[in-house]
Curated annotation (Swiss-Prot):
<dbReference type="Pfam" id="PF00163">
    <property type="entry name" value="Ribosomal_S4"/>
</dbReference>
<dbReference type="InterPro" id="IPR002942">
    <property type="entry name" value="S4_RNA-bd"/>
</dbReference>
<dbReference type="InterPro" id="IPR005709">
    <property type="entry name" value="Ribosomal_uS4_bac-type"/>
</dbReference>
<dbReference type="Pfam" id="PF01479">
    <property type="entry name" value="S4"/>
</dbReference>
<keyword id="KW-0687">Ribonucleoprotein</keyword>
<dbReference type="InterPro" id="IPR018079">
    <property type="entry name" value="Ribosomal_uS4_CS"/>
</dbReference>
<comment type="function">
    <text>One of the primary rRNA binding proteins, it binds directly to 16S rRNA where it nucleates assembly of the body of the 30S subunit.</text>
</comment>
<comment type="function">
    <text>With S5 and S12 plays an important role in translational accuracy.</text>
</comment>
<keyword id="KW-0689">Ribosomal protein</keyword>
<comment type="similarity">
    <text>Belongs to the universal ribosomal protein uS4 family.</text>
</comment>
<dbReference type="GO" id="GO:0015935">
    <property type="term" value="C:small ribosomal subunit"/>
</dbReference>
<keyword id="KW-0694">RNA-binding</keyword>
<dbReference type="GO" id="GO:0042274">
    <property type="term" value="P:ribosomal small subunit biogenesis"/>
</dbReference>
<dbReference type="InterPro" id="IPR036986">
    <property type="entry name" value="S4_RNA-bd_sf"/>
</dbReference>
<protein>
    <recommendedName>
        <fullName>Small ribosomal subunit protein uS4</fullName>
    </recommendedName>
</protein>
<feature type="domain" description="S4 RNA-binding">
    <location>
        <begin position="96"/>
        <end position="156"/>
    </location>
</feature>
<dbReference type="GO" id="GO:0006412">
    <property type="term" value="P:translation"/>
</dbReference>
Length: 206
């Protein structure tokens, strides 16, 4: 599947917030002007219409999880089909992606790096190699680094970096073993308050 390969910080500047596309070793505002959009007229902040705000929110979430438009729309359709709040369902589906779980557990410094680990067969789920980044992790699934991949310096560095941030409460991680358990489905209160999923629902409901 095609992926965006351009400058990562430019995307964060476009959305005006940290999309966590970089490792987090340094605060993003020390690397770039996060409150200034890229381009010659980046300092100007145009007033957005309702549609513009909805579109920006969708783009922001899509870029956070590194998903292209067609796949994101499919996630929305599935979220809308499920019982409950469509917006919350959407976020739960995105959080349940294997590449995201690998990132959340601290085995990778970014979601892009996590996606690469999965694609390169460095991750096992319940003892079996899974190389599909979009694989949906279920409750009680055990996600671990493959034995022959445990010596990778980047994985060790990512785990050290993960110690500096709070791990999600719906995951249980044993860093020494390089494995973790998807204990429960995250609730909305567990997830970022910086995301307004209602705008995305409004956009796709038109």
């Amino acid at each position: 599947m095609a992926r965006y390969l351009g400058p990562k910080l430019k995307l964060s500047r476009r959305e005006g917030t940290d999309l966590f596309l970089k490792s987090g070793v340094r605060a993003i505002d020390t690397k770039c002007k996060i409150d200034t959009a890229p381009g010659q007229h980046g300092a100007r902040k145009p007033r957005l219409s309702d549609y513009g705000s909805q579109l920006r929110e969708k783009q922001k979430v899509r870029r956070i999880y590194g998903i292209l438009e067609r796949q994101f729309r499919n996630y929305y359709k599935e979220a809308n089909r499920l019982k409950g709040n469509t917006g919350e369902n959407l976020l739960v589906l995105l959080e349940g992606r294997l590449d995201n779980v690998v990132y959340r557990m601290g085995f990778a410094a970014t979601r892009a790096e996590a996606r690469q680990l999965v694609s390169h067969k460095a991750i096992v789920v319940n003892g079996r190699v899974v190389n599909i980044p979009s694989f949906q992790v279920s409750v009680n699934d055990v996600v671990a680094v493959r034995e022959k991949s445990k010596k990778q310096a980047r994985i060790k560095a990512s785990l050290e970096l993960a110690e500096q941030r709070e791990r999600p409460t719906w995951l249980e991680v044993e860093a020494a073993k390089m494995e973790g358990v998807f204990k429960r489905v995250p609730e909305r209160s567990d997830l970022s308050a910086d995301i307004n999923e209602h705008l995305i629902v409004e956009l796709y409901s038109k």
